[in-house]
């Protein structure tokens, strides 16, 4: 039996760019889930859920989260959550570019990639460097942390104390010898 080598098209993205785009997509997915879960927990058992909780459009769930979760907090916690809401709105256009575009690059600017898409009958182009993608991913991680722990490290410590502790996937793999050193690095 003859073995065929699969023929595939290259994305023309570097390994770092592929990793960072994947990180952004993953972080945003978790962000949407965090917002949805917090909003869902704001409803009483048996209470009718609004159509926005069908989770078909994140912007609708986000508005409901602002109303039912963020605006119900006191003082500093409310300020932290409102700031995250503003950051999510700001980052949303970049997320759309990352997720819904075809990527392009030019030989005269090899350290830059351009996300190209059609939106509302116009062509949109957003340029990114690897460092900008890394910054975007980090900002999303920070937003997620602040949404889950608006009181900061004290909230995280309380959660850990109440749950009896936690070990990350990386920690688990490291302890049980399943991870390779390159898998544990973020660079």
Question: Can you describe what each PLM-predicted range is?
Answer:
Residues 1-68, 82-93, 97-108, 134, ...:
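Amphipathic alpha-helical interface elements
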Residues 74-75:
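Short, flexible loop segments at the rims of nucleotide/cofactor-binding pockets, characterized by
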Residues 105-123:
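Acidic interhelical loop/turn segments
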Residues 126-127:
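Short loop/turn segments that flank or connect secondary-structure elements
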Residues 153-187:
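Charged phosphate-binding loop/patch that engages nucleotide di/tri-phosphates or the phosphate backbone
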């Amino acid at each position: 039996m003859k073995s065929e080598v699969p023929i595939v098209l290259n994305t023309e993205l570097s390994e770092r760019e592929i990793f960072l785009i994947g990180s952004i997509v993953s972080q945003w997915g978790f962000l949407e889930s965090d917002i949805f879960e917090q909003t869902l927990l704001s409803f009483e058992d048996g209470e009718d859920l609004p159509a926005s909780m069908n989770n078909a459009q994140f912007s609708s769930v986000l508005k409901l989260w602002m109303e039912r979760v963020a605006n119900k907090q006191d003082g500093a916690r409310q300020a932290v959550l409102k700031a995250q809401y503003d950051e999510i709105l700001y980052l949303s256009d970049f997320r759309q570019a990352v997720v819904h575009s075809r990527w392009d690059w030019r030989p005269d600017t090899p350290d830059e990639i351009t996300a190209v898409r059609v939106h509302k009958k116009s062509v949109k182009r957003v340029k990114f460097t690897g460092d900008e993608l890394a910054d975007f991913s980090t900002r999303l991680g920070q937003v997620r942390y602040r949404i889950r722990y608006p009181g900061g490290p004290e909230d995280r410590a309380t959660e850990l104390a109440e749950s009896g502790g936690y070990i990350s996937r990386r920690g688990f793999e490291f302890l049980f010898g399943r991870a390779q050193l390159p898998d544990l690095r973020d660079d």
